[in-house]
Protein backbone atom coordinates (compact mmCIF):
# COMPACT_ATOMS: atom_id res chain seq x y z
CA UNK A 1 0.00 0.00 0.00
CA UNK A 2 1.32 3.45 -0.91
CA UNK A 3 2.19 5.88 1.84
CA UNK A 4 0.20 9.07 2.04
CA UNK A 5 1.99 12.21 0.99
CA UNK A 6 2.27 15.12 3.40
CA UNK A 7 -0.57 17.43 2.48
CA UNK A 8 -0.89 21.19 2.21
CA UNK A 9 -4.13 22.61 3.60
CA UNK A 10 -6.35 24.85 1.57
CA UNK A 11 -5.52 23.34 -1.78
CA UNK A 12 -8.20 21.80 -3.89
CA UNK A 13 -8.73 21.06 -7.52
CA UNK A 14 -11.53 22.69 -9.50
CA UNK A 15 -14.87 20.99 -9.01
CA UNK A 16 -14.36 20.37 -5.31
CA UNK A 17 -12.08 17.33 -5.50
CA UNK A 18 -9.26 17.73 -3.04
CA UNK A 19 -5.81 17.72 -4.58
CA UNK A 20 -3.46 18.80 -1.78
CA UNK A 21 -0.06 20.09 -2.87
CA UNK A 22 3.26 18.51 -1.91
CA UNK A 23 6.63 20.25 -1.78
CA UNK A 24 9.76 19.46 -3.72
CA UNK A 25 11.55 18.55 -0.47
CA UNK A 26 8.84 16.05 0.43
CA UNK A 27 9.07 14.34 -2.95
CA UNK A 28 12.88 14.32 -3.00
CA UNK A 29 12.86 12.69 0.46
CA UNK A 30 10.47 10.00 -0.75
CA UNK A 31 12.61 9.33 -3.80
CA UNK A 32 15.70 9.10 -1.57
CA UNK A 33 13.88 6.40 0.41
CA UNK A 34 13.34 4.46 -2.80
CA UNK A 35 9.63 5.10 -3.12
CA UNK A 36 8.12 4.86 -6.59
CA UNK A 37 6.31 7.98 -7.75
CA UNK A 38 4.77 8.53 -11.17
CA UNK A 39 5.29 12.05 -12.47
CA UNK A 40 2.73 13.60 -14.81
CA UNK A 41 3.76 16.61 -16.90
CA UNK A 42 0.70 18.88 -17.02
CA UNK A 43 2.41 21.88 -18.60
CA UNK A 44 0.39 23.65 -21.25
CA UNK A 45 1.34 22.90 -24.84
CA UNK A 46 3.51 26.01 -25.35
CA UNK A 47 5.53 25.51 -22.15
CA UNK A 48 5.91 21.79 -22.81
CA UNK A 49 7.15 22.33 -26.38
CA UNK A 50 9.61 25.06 -25.36
CA UNK A 51 11.26 22.89 -22.69
CA UNK A 52 13.89 20.26 -23.36
CA UNK A 53 13.50 18.62 -19.93
CA UNK A 54 10.98 16.81 -17.75
CA UNK A 55 10.90 15.11 -14.36
CA UNK A 56 12.18 11.51 -14.35
CA UNK A 57 9.88 9.13 -16.22
CA UNK A 58 7.15 11.75 -16.56
CA UNK A 59 4.31 11.12 -18.97
CA UNK A 60 2.45 14.00 -20.55
CA UNK A 61 -1.20 14.52 -19.73
CA UNK A 62 -2.53 17.77 -21.08
CA UNK A 63 -4.92 19.89 -19.02
CA UNK A 64 -6.78 20.41 -22.29
CA UNK A 65 -8.05 16.83 -22.03
CA UNK A 66 -5.55 14.68 -23.96
CA UNK A 67 -6.08 11.47 -22.00
CA UNK A 68 -4.24 8.88 -24.10
CA UNK A 69 -1.54 8.43 -21.44
CA UNK A 70 -4.01 7.59 -18.64
CA UNK A 71 -3.58 3.81 -19.12
CA UNK A 72 0.18 4.23 -18.49
CA UNK A 73 -0.43 5.28 -14.88
CA UNK A 74 -1.40 2.51 -12.45
CA UNK A 75 -4.35 3.63 -10.28
CA UNK A 76 -2.65 2.43 -7.08
CA UNK A 77 0.58 4.36 -7.67
CA UNK A 78 1.49 7.67 -6.02
CA UNK A 79 1.25 10.41 -8.65
CA UNK A 80 2.70 13.92 -8.63
CA UNK A 81 1.46 16.33 -11.29
CA UNK A 82 3.40 19.46 -12.23
CA UNK A 83 3.14 22.50 -14.47
CA UNK A 84 4.60 26.00 -14.77
CA UNK A 85 1.47 28.08 -14.18
CA UNK A 86 0.41 30.16 -11.22
CA UNK A 87 -1.00 28.23 -8.27
CA UNK A 88 -0.38 24.92 -10.07
CA UNK A 89 -3.65 25.40 -11.99
CA UNK A 90 -2.90 22.92 -14.80
CA UNK A 91 -1.40 20.38 -12.40
CA UNK A 92 -4.52 20.64 -10.20
CA UNK A 93 -6.78 20.15 -13.21
CA UNK A 94 -4.89 17.04 -14.30
CA UNK A 95 -4.89 15.76 -10.70
CA UNK A 96 -8.68 16.14 -10.70
CA UNK A 97 -8.90 14.18 -13.97
CA UNK A 98 -6.88 11.35 -12.43
CA UNK A 99 -8.85 11.40 -9.17
CA UNK A 100 -12.13 11.23 -11.11
CA UNK A 101 -10.84 8.02 -12.69
CA UNK A 102 -10.07 6.33 -9.40
CA UNK A 103 -6.53 7.46 -8.59
CA UNK A 104 -6.31 8.12 -4.85
CA UNK A 105 -2.76 9.32 -4.14
CA UNK A 106 -2.48 12.28 -6.55
CA UNK A 107 -0.93 15.63 -5.68
CA UNK A 108 0.16 18.74 -7.61
CA UNK A 109 3.75 19.80 -6.96
CA UNK A 110 3.86 23.11 -5.05
CA UNK A 111 5.82 25.55 -7.22
CA UNK A 112 5.74 23.12 -10.14
CA UNK A 113 8.51 22.50 -12.64
CA UNK A 114 10.32 25.73 -11.78
CA UNK A 115 10.56 24.89 -8.06
CA UNK A 116 11.83 21.40 -8.94
CA UNK A 117 14.52 22.81 -11.24
CA UNK A 118 15.55 25.48 -8.69
CA UNK A 119 15.98 22.75 -6.06
CA UNK A 120 18.22 20.79 -8.46
CA UNK A 121 15.73 17.93 -8.58
CA UNK A 122 16.62 15.26 -11.14
CA UNK A 123 15.58 15.98 -14.72
CA UNK A 124 15.83 14.06 -17.96
CA UNK A 125 15.59 15.04 -21.62
CA UNK A 126 12.10 15.42 -22.98
CA UNK A 127 11.55 13.55 -26.21
CA UNK A 128 9.19 14.72 -28.93
CA UNK A 129 6.58 12.21 -27.78
CA UNK A 130 6.77 13.13 -24.14
Task: Annotate each PLM feature.
Residues 70-116:
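Catalytic cysteine-centered active loop of the rhodanese-like fold, especially the PTP/DSP P-loop
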Residues 54-56, 102:
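Short, structured coil segments at secondary-structure junctions
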Residues 33-34, 76, 119:
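Structured helix-beta-strand junction loops
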Residues 52, 120:
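Short, flexible helix/strand-to-coil boundary loops that buttress conserved ligand/catalytic motifs
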Residues 63-68:
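Alpha-helical scaffolding within the catalytic cores
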Residues 21, 39, 58-60, 106-108:
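Conserved beta-strand scaffold positions in the cores of enzyme catalytic domains, especially
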Residues 35, 102-104, 121:
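Short phosphate-binding/catalytic loops that engage adenosine nucleotides
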Residues 1-50, 124-130:
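Flexible, polar/low-complexity N-terminal or interdomain linker segments that lie immediately upstream
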